Each structure stands twice: as C-alpha cells, then as structure tokens.
Amino acid sequence: MDDVVEVDAPAEVVWSVLTDFDRYGDWNPFISRCRADLTVGAPIDMRVEQLAPRPIRMREWIRSVTAGREFSYSMKPIPLGALRSKRSHTLTPLAGDRTRYESHFELDGWLAPLVGLLFGRGFKKGFPGMTTAVEREAERRHAR
C-alpha cells in the first residue's frame, strides 16, 4: 500500500512532524500514541486506531534510519513465513520548500490474506488518513 503527497513545507518540517512521536495524538488519526528513539533495532510502540472497535497496541522494530530522509520499521516475523510486515516513511526535498512524502506498507506471508480480511478496511482508511494528516500538520507548522 503506497501513498505519495507533495507537501508545501521543507523536508526538515515534514521530518519533524514524522519524528515528533509525543505529539502524534494531536494530529494523527491512525496512530494516537507512539514511542520510539529511532535507533536501528529499537522498539517502536504504537497505539493504532481504526483497525478494530478498540485501539490496538503494537510493538514493531526500527529497521532503518537516515536522519531527515527516511525511517522504516517492521513486526517480528511470525515463524515459517506466516506473516511479516514493513512500514516506511521517505522524504524527498523538492524545489520551492516543498517535499515529496512517500508512505509505504507491505504485508507478506501465508497469513497476510487473513489479516487483510480482518483489518483491510482499517488499513485502507488509516494509512491514507495518516498521509493526509502529515501533509496538513507539516503545512500548518510551516505557516507559523
């Protein structure tokens, strides 16, 4: 699942929105709480909305970080190739203090179709909703 937007704010501002985990609850409709220190191998703990009637707590693991440019994380794979995931956020600076923000999510393994049935509607609402919210929050902060 991929979403791409061009944000009317510099990459530094968009990066600050994405990595200001303590403030996710102020603007993010999909992840209402997040704790992470962006160290490869460290946990990222999230409270995810819109996947079930109640929020779901998730712990995933930081896979990559290029400061100011990208970070990604994934769940611990379930044995025998049953399920694995990857989520990434990538920023590309553009001319005129604009930024391309790319949001990517993938889910693989033989349990992926079942997870898709259970949470697919939430994924289709949540990931694009967060992308739009990142855009709005970055533009709001830049306009200050």
Residues of each region from the PLM?
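Short solvent-exposed loop/turn micro-motifs enriched in small/polar/acidic residues
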Residues: 27-29, 55, 82-84
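Short, intrinsically disordered, mixed-charge
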Residues: 16-29, 120, 124, 128, ...
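Glycine-rich portal/gate segments that line the openings of hydrophobic small-molecule binding cavities
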Residues: 35-80, 129-144
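Hydrophobic ligand-binding cavity/cleft-lining segments
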Residues: 1-39
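Short strand-connecting beta-turns/loops that link adjacent beta-strands
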Residues: 10, 39, 67-68, 94-98
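Beta-strand/loop substructures that line and gate deep hydrophobic ligand-binding cavities in soluble
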Residues: 76-129
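Hydrophobic/aromatic beta-strand elements that line small-molecule binding cavities or substrate pockets
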Residues: 3-5, 57-64, 85-93
